[in-house]
């Protein structure tokens, strides 16, 4: 069996790794992939006429490759090619694909639409309002602010369009960045403003063939760029961002007063599973959230449904409330949960495209995985000091220690290229995954492996998993 995985980062490499463990699979192609996509057996970068596929947006080239290589199955990782209709195109050519068609991506492509849909079908959500006028949004924030508020760009923003605000000033700045300064382009033409919930946030995934829907693992995701006590890191970031000098004390005061934020990212790490998601809680999420979405959504949907859940305690029970919906697997949550998958990835995927998911059992190891992202941090170079991920960062920095780190942990490449050695190409560079019978054992393996890796400007959060009870 030949499988094509469409992705450019760590999630795609984790998906390919899961397929590589199936005896049914002989070859796995990753398009466009990256310099670490061939870390695992059976995996190779897709090439068309001797050239790599240029990007996840190169729909024509991806379809041509799939036809030419006669792949038996395609699995789409990111939201962008899904929203561009890649599954539609592949199926037109007779190539089965795991992922929703273009019209079904509205669930992720418009947060405003999704919030209205969830409210209509009775799925628990935070109090919210949608806006296409920044001044009206600001007026609402001034009236409604109570212990935090969240501002979200309506459209696709690579996981960076969400601002979790601790003060009115932060929220007003978020509105300006999204709607006035157009930080995310047309994705910020509309916004969602919602109450900030307190609880346990979980990236919950389910797999569906359009009829049957089953849990597909979950993770605790870490979005903030810096640990809460990493004032030195915040200082370097904001000096690089604003080109102004700050002392550590000034940054600490501005941070405490809510005049600067710890920025959100696509993800700095993840832990899977979370002990709070017991069988009872998982069933509650399925019954209150996942099943109603699939049953009431009027468009064909097959593939991964990924609602971001806040588990809020009410009357002694953890109640799931949906923060947003995604139509693909989580990242870096996938890197934390897929190493635990014991079921055959190829068998699951074929059951999805053939409409017989009811015949397949989803089994995950009881082990814990802790995934920590090594990112391109603040670095001074030819163009001066750059702030680093999630803002502008240097690339082409040499990486050492990957092979040594592989002896202790699983390494998924997010943004690297292979030349004479390995060099950085992105903000998120590597996701290092430790696996063990306890969270502490998994953390120890991940951080021990990270100490063996080095590149200029490298940084990572040091507290991933510390807040998760055993």
From Swiss-Prot:
Keywords: ATP-binding, Ligase, Magnesium, Manganese, Metal-binding, Nucleotide-binding, Purine biosynthesis
Highest taxon of source: Archaea
Matches recorded under InterPro entries: ATP-grasp, ATP_grasp_subdomain_1, PreATP-grasp_dom_sf, PRibGlycinamid_synth_ATP-grasp, PRibGlycinamide_synth, PRibGlycinamide_synth_C-dom, PRibGlycinamide_synth_C_sf, PRibGlycinamide_synth_N
Catalytic activity: 5-phospho-beta-D-ribosylamine + glycine + ATP = N(1)-(5-phospho-beta-D-ribosyl)glycinamide + ADP + phosphate + H(+)
Pathway: Purine metabolism; IMP biosynthesis via de novo pathway; N(1)-(5-phospho-D-ribosyl)glycinamide from 5-phospho-alpha-D-ribose 1-diphosphate: step 2/2
A Pfam family reported for this protein in Swiss-Prot or TrEMBL: GARS_N
Signal sequence segment: none
Annotated positions binding Mg(2+): 324, 326
GO BP field: 'de novo' IMP biosynthetic process; purine nucleobase biosynthetic process
PROSITE patterns per the UniProt record, alphabetical: ATP_GRASP
Binding site for ATP: 142-203
Details of cofactor binding: Binds 1 Mg(2+) or Mn(2+) ion per subunit.
Cofactor: Mg(2+); Mn(2+)
Start and end residues of each ATP-grasp domain: 115-354
UniProt cross-references to NCBIfam families, sorted A to Z: purD
HAMAP family: GARS
Family affiliation: Belongs to the GARS family.
Name the UniProt record assigns to this protein: Phosphoribosylamine--glycine ligase
Native organism: Archaeoglobus fulgidus (strain ATCC 49558 / DSM 4304 / JCM 9628 / NBRC 100126 / VC-16)
Lineage: Archaea, Methanobacteriati, Methanobacteriota, Archaeoglobi, Archaeoglobales
């Amino acid at each position: 069996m030949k499988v094509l995985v469409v992705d450019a980062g760590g999630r795609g490499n984790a998906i390919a790794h899961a397929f590589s463990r199936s005896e049914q699979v002989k070859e796995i192609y990753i398009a466009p992939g990256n310099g670490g996509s061939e870390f695992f057996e059976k995996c190779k970068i897709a090439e068309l006429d001797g050239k790599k596929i240029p990007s996840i947006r190169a729909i024509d080239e991806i379809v041509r490759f799939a036809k030419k290589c006669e792949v038996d199955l395609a699995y789409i990782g990111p939201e962008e090619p899904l929203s561009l209709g890649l599954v539609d195109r592949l199926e037109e050519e007779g190539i089965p694909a795991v992922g929703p068609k273009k019209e079904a991506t509205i669930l992720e492509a418009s947060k405003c639409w999704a919030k209205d849909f969830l409210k209509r079908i009775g799925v628990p959500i935070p109090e919210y309002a949608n806006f296409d006028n920044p001044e009206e949004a600001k007026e609402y924030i001034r009236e409604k602010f109570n212990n935090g508020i969240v501002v979200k760009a309506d459209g696709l923003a690579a996981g960076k369009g969400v601002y979790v605000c601790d003060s009115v000033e932060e929220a007003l700045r978020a509105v300006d960045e999204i709607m006035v300064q157009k930080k995310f382009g047309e994705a910020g033409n509309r916004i969602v403003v919602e109450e900030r919930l307190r609880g346990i946030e979980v990236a919950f995934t389910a797999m569906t063939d359009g009829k049957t829907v089953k849990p597909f693992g979950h993770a605790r995701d870490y979005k903030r760029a810096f640990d809460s006590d990493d004032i030195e890191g915040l200082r370097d970031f904001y000096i690089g961002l604003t080109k102004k000098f700050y002392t550590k004390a000034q940054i600490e005061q501005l941070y405490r007063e809510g005049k600067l934020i710890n920025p959100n990212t696509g993800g700095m790490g993840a832990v899977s599973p979370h002990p709070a998601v017991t069988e009872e809680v998982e069933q509650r999420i399925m019954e209150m959230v996942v099943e109603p979405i699939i049953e009431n959504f009027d468009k064909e949907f097959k593939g991964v449904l990924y609602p971001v859940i806040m588990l809020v305690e009410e009357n002694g029970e953890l109640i799931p409330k949906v923060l947003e919906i995604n139509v693909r697997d989580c990242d870096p949550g996938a890197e934390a949960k897929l190493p635990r998958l014991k079921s055959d990835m190829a068998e699951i995927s074929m059951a999805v495209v053939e409409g017989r998911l009811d015949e397949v059992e989803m089994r995950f190891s009881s082990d814990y995985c802790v995934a920590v992202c090594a990112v391109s941090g603040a670095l001074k170079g030819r163009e001066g000091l750059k702030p680093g991920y999630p803002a502008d960062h240097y690339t082409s920095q040499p990486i050492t220690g990957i092979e040594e780190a592989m002896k202790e942990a699983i390494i998924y490449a997010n943004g690297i290229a292979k030349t004479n050695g390995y060099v950085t190409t992105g903000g998120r560079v590597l996701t290092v995954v430790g696996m063990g019978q306890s969270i502490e054992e998994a953390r120890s393996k991940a951080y021990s492996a990270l100490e063996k890796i080095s590149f200029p400007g490298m940084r990572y959060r040091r507290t991933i998993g510390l807040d998760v009870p055993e």
